[in-house]
């Protein structure tokens, strides 16, 4: 059973041979990420003054950061005024020529990992940057018609991108969409259902109709809409803070949703206690996964930003491997 089949069986709850994982060497990584190219665009940070870097993204948004490791945040959106909406030009992400490298990776016979095409987000993650998050959240109440028009344009573009990925041969598409704070969803769940859920349903259907799985990353406590995400067709939820939801709460979705998590980066890893880290790794495997599937073990890729030496995640990796040997566990 190769990596692709292990991930597929994990997502569909059809008995993978072992734990699916995205761990660094000397362990295993069952996923390979492939992305479209944008000729002429380079994400290059430039120093605008001491201690501040900026770059302009493919949408026209200006990003800023005050360190050298984080992804930064939008400081000026391309759509500062709704008067520009009708003339706003979106990048041609879905041009077939941009997927040549994706097609090449998917055509490699020796590439046996689960192939995941990257999306810039679903409509919220794209639109909120064009207006800046603070303004966009106000727009939901103050300019609902303009918000709906912008979301639809972005949704149409993303649907085309998903089609191109499917035709290139990917197994899944993945998008980031940070919907939560430490306490709850950023907006009332009913508003999310009214404004955003239809777009989720449509884009998941575009993927599923072409045999492509949908993977979503989100930070924050979005527990209130997990049942909705199951309903619309999200196949995998990638959480870096599983303790924020409660592992026992997530376990209630066993059989309906696959979770992909490292040991909690905010709480458990920060203890730098090997016993606690190992115990959570075991709990994640046994409560969210197991021999029938449902869990992918993760590794947070930016140790400097969480203030930890790699050692502490390697403690988690060893525990994931130990408890993810389903054949041995069955003996």
Cite the ranges covered by each PLM segment.
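Active-site loop segments of alpha/beta catalytic cores
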Residues: 1-26, 89-331
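Residue-level detector of functionally special positions within alpha-helical transmembrane segments
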Residues: 2, 39, 57-60
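Glycine-centered secondary-structure boundary/capping sites
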Residues: 13, 32-37, 51, 60
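Short, basic/low-complexity N-terminal boundary segments at the transition from targeting/disordered tails
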Residues: 19-43
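Short aromatic-enriched loop/helix-cap "lid" or pocket-rim segments at secondary-structure transitions
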Residues: 32-36, 67-69, 129, 309-312
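Short acidic, Pro/Gly- and aromatic-enriched capping/linker segments at domain boundaries
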Residues: 38-55
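A contiguous, low-structure linker/loop signature
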Residues: 50-99, 107-117
């Amino acid at each position: 059973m190769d990596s692709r089949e292990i991930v597929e069986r994990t997502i569909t709850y059809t008995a993978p041979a072992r734990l699916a994982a995205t761990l660094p060497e000397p362990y295993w990584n069952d996923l390979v990420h492939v992305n479209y190219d944008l000729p002429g665009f380079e994400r290059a940070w430039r120093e605008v003054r001491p201690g501040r870097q900026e770059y302009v993204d493919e949408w026209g948004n200006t990003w800023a950061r005050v360190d050298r490791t984080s992804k930064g945040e939008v400081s000026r959106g391309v759509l500062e005024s709704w008067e520009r909406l009708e003339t706003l030009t979106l990048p041609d992400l879905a041009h077939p020529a941009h997927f040549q490298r994706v097609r090449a990776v998917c055509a490699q016979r020796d590439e046996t990992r689960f192939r995941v095409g990257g999306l810039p987000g679903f409509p919220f993650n794209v639109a909120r940057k064009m207006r800046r998050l603070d303004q966009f959240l106000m727009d939901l109440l103050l300019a609902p018609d303009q918000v709906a028009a912008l979301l639809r344009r972005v949704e149409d573009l993303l649907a085309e991108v998903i089609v191109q990925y499917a035709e290139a041969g990917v197994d899944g598409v993945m998008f980031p969409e940070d919907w939560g704070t430490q306490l709850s969803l950023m907006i009332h769940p009913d508003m999310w259902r009214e404004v955003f859920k239809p777009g989720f349903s449509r884009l998941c259907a575009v993927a599923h109709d072409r045999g492509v799985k949908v993977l979503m990353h989100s930070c924050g406590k979005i527990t209130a809409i997990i049942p909705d995400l199951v309903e619309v067709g999200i196949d995998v939820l990638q959480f870096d803070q599983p303790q924020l939801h409660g592992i026992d709460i997530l376990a209630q979705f066993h059989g309906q949703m696959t979770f992909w998590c490292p040991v909690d980066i905010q709480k458990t890893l920060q203890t730098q206690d090997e016993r606690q880290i190992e115990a959570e790794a075991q709990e994640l495997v046994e409560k969210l996964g197991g021999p029938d599937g449902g869990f992918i073990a993760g590794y947070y890729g930016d140790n400097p930003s969480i203030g930890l030496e790699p050692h502490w995640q390697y403690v988690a990796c060893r525990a994931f491997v130990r408890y993810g040997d389903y054949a041995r566990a069955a003996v």
